[in-house]
Amino acid sequence: MELKNGELHIWKYSLNTEDYISEKNKPLLSKNELTRCNQFLQESDKMRYICNHRFVRNVLSLYLNIAASKINFDLETRGKPYIKNSNLFFNYSYRASYGLLAISKNQAVGVDIEKIKPLQDILTFSEFSFSEKEKEIIFKSENELEPLFTFWTFKEAIIKLLGIGLNADLTKIDLSNFFYNELNPLSYSNNEIFTIKKIIVNQGFKAAFALKGNLLKYQEFDFNEHKTYNQN
């Protein structure tokens, strides 16, 4: 598959696809991935990890035109994975049985998906997570969880794009303007331009991507409908 500068591809997939949750998926992963997989205590978490990383490798193989098992990943200083010797940027996120993979060319990208769920102390969570403008939007809403999780996916996506980690002061990352201005590139910090957009996913979930720079073209794909991969 071809990807040009300014384009972004979002792949959606289901992590409970029976064909992928099995021991046969393990040989596709690297030694580092298998080591990480074995650190999970629950078998279901191990299988979810294997399934997710197989999806990521199979989709990326379509763009790199090499076997999925031959893709070499490395980690940035803060743990964000990247592909060695490639101008492709990618990021993935999964919750419950759903996942997203974002792919761009020469532009950093972040993506996040979250399951909407009740919070024990929404006021305290918001106080440490959102700016004053974001909180104003959240608490003016009839259903506070809807904008709250929208903003949380915005934050996760931009944090993953920048690779700064959740230990950053999230209240200083004000993304309130993006709530009403989807796809309009806005300045976030240091005069850098970012594009943030909600992704429509299954009911009960929220998702978003963040792209550094302008977005010229945006496409979504369903992994479960795509049958050709460079697996071996």
Give residue ranges: language-model regions:
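Core catalytic alpha/beta fold that binds nucleotide/phospho-ligands
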Residues: 1-232
